[in-house]
Structures are given as C-alpha cells and as structure tokens.
Amino acid sequence: MKIELCLYSGYKIYPGHGKRYARTDGRVYTFLNAKCEASFLMKRNPREITWTVLYRRKHKKGQQEEIQKKRSRRTAKFQRAITGASLTEIMAKRNQKPEVRKAQREQAVKAAKEKKKADQVGKRKAPAKARATAPKTKAPKTVKAAAPRVGGKR
C-alpha cells in the first residue's frame, strides 16, 4: 500500500483517494481533494493557509517536543534552621554517634509508652462512672408519609 503526500496541504493520500494533475510541461502533481487543487491553481501560498501542514510547521503548532527542551532549574542543597531547632542543634544531633542516638530513641519510646499506659488507665475509670449514672433510652423515629403523586402519565 503506497501512501502519497498532497503537494499543497501536506496530508497523507491513501489509495483510492486524491487527484492527479498533469501540466502540459510534463510535471504531475498529486492533491488530496478539489479544495487543495483549486487553491494550488489560484496560486495561494500554503504557508499562509491555516489548515495546511506547511502553515502548522511554520507557526510551530502542535509540537510537544519543543516543550520538553525547556530546562528545569537544578535543586541546590541548602542547610538552614527549622522552627524549634537551630542549625547548631541540628548539626550536633547529626554528628552524634549512632549508639548515643539509639539510646536516646529507646528512652523516648519508653517514656511515650508509659504515658500511653497511664492515659488508658485513666480512660478506663471514667467510662465506668458514666455508664452507671444514666442508661439511654431509644426515641422512636417518625416516618414521613409519601406525598401523593400529582398529574403526569406516570
């Protein structure tokens, strides 16, 4: 299957489509349709006709590759203080030995677990008192009656 290109528009011409125009000097032109042929015979410049491929190339339409060429800024590493911790504190923590850091972490975890346990014990005592004071009763739900249908076929 041979696919040709329209001389005027630049679009592909599939077999069974298009039109050939032979001039008296022997040159043969292939056109996609009568519109392209008529424009060619009127000596219209395809670079100025908006729907042609030549116009789209000239005016850089529909080219995603161009967008990718734009360079993105490189991220630069920058050290600065964070809220609640100065840069010197951060650097001191970073330069600590792993054993010291591990011991601190374990100590912090232990303290958090103890606090959680104490909170749970406090929570267990409070709900027991609340249950004994007032048993709940369920209120019956009011069911809304369906409105009568008015007019119409259905």
From Swiss-Prot:
Keyword line: Ribonucleoprotein, Ribosomal protein
Region (Disordered) location: 92-154
Record has Ribonucleoprotein as a keyword: yes
Keyword check for Nucleotide-binding: no
InterPro entries for the chain: L24e/L24_sf, Ribosomal_eL24, Ribosomal_eL24-rel_N, Ribosomal_eL24_CS, TRASH_dom
GO cellular component, one term: cytosolic large ribosomal subunit
Gene3D superfamilies cross-referenced by the UniProt entry: 6.10.250.1270, Ribosomal protein L24e
GO biological process: cytoplasmic translation
SUPFAM superfamilies, A to Z: Glucocorticoid receptor-like (DNA-binding domain) (SSF57716)
Bias kind Basic and acidic residues: ranges: 96-122
GO molecular function: mRNA binding; structural constituent of ribosome
Biased composition (Low complexity): 129-154
Record family assignment: Belongs to the eukaryotic ribosomal protein eL24 family.
Protein name in the entry: Large ribosomal subunit protein eL24
Organism: Branchiostoma belcheri
Organism lineage string: Eukaryota, Metazoa, Chordata, Cephalochordata, Leptocardii
